[in-house]
């Protein structure tokens, strides 16, 4: 079982940047050493958003975007390597999630698509890449998501305390870590995605810093109840979703019944939607003693306050307080999953995804030996 330095690369549904993290990984340890966030150019972000909202495109357009994203991921890795004065031979492998542009786990032919050509990353960095993590789980009847609960369990499970780890990215998901019980985890619905989409359309800002705009508004109960009536929220766990479902078009459909709404009131209502749907799922799962929050939503004081209010008796804190960077959690998880793949160890948890069995995940894109690279 190889131990050493791994790099994790994550570009999530929030599209707020490419997270790259360097960690030393052994059988008993994941030690983060460095990280950075690499910007996603506006034009590429707009193309990704268009695909996720169902706009048509040619195979040529998709292929070009796949290549450009692969090169962008490689640039992000190379920036971290320069920052840390690393050579390709200093890193065992890169675990790259890719950019999800479609995720459809239901139906007669469930499928998911992450783009960002891993061949480009391997060729331009000179480091072996492990990618395409989700489709093996789907081939075994699973949802293909979430995959990070296995990592949460490895690092944050407690021998006696009933914990949940909540990641509030574009989509929010929870991992239940209860002593003596199988790990469970699933998506709860929108995290930051609709909040970010609304403020981007209304104010041209990528996100609502410190929930300043939402805090100026009031929750619109009719709109909130209308959104909560969406049948997805009533689906049993395990379940997963993404931008292809909860997008700006979804928000517009619900808002169309309520003309003349103030922008800040909509923002406040979207924050409440995120908090309510998370808290309901936490309670349906039996609750927890400690809720550890990571992702961009952990820096949203309104969301954190509402979660604490909706979950009395639960200590709501961040994973940073438990020693794991909330901003880098998912990138770290995919570095760890790459380590497991190369070690021949399963990366999914059937109790989380619904797969018929645990399996080694991903495909390996080997780097050329140093003597073969110019």
From Swiss-Prot:
Gene3D superfamilies reported for this sequence: 3.30.420.40
Catalytic activity: 1,6-anhydro-N-acetyl-beta-muramate + ATP + H2O = N-acetyl-D-muramate 6-phosphate + ADP + H(+)
Similarity-based family: Belongs to the anhydro-N-acetylmuramic acid kinase family.
Protein name, entry field: Anhydro-N-acetylmuramic acid kinase
Molecular functions per Gene Ontology: ATP binding; kinase activity; phosphotransferase activity, alcohol group as acceptor
Pathway entry: Amino-sugar metabolism; 1,6-anhydro-N-acetylmuramate degradation; Cell wall biogenesis; peptidoglycan recycling
Name of one Pfam family that matches: AnmK
Domain of life the protein comes from: Bacteria
Chain's gene name: anmK
Record-linked InterPro entries: Anhydro_N_Ac-Mur_kinase, ATPase_NBD
EC number(s) given by UniProt: 2.7.1.170
Transmembrane segments: none
Key words of the record: ATP-binding, Carbohydrate metabolism, Kinase, Nucleotide-binding, Transferase
GO biological process: 1,6-anhydro-N-acetyl-beta-muramic acid catabolic process; amino sugar metabolic process; peptidoglycan turnover
Function description: Catalyzes the specific phosphorylation of 1,6-anhydro-N-acetylmuramic acid (anhMurNAc) with the simultaneous cleavage of the 1,6-anhydro ring, generating MurNAc-6-P. Is required for the utilization of anhMurNAc either imported from the medium or derived from its own cell wall murein, and thus plays a role in cell wall recycling.
Positions contributing to ATP binding: 12-19
Origin species: Klebsiella pneumoniae subsp. pneumoniae (strain ATCC 700721 / MGH 78578)
Keyword set includes Aminoacyl-tRNA synthetase: no
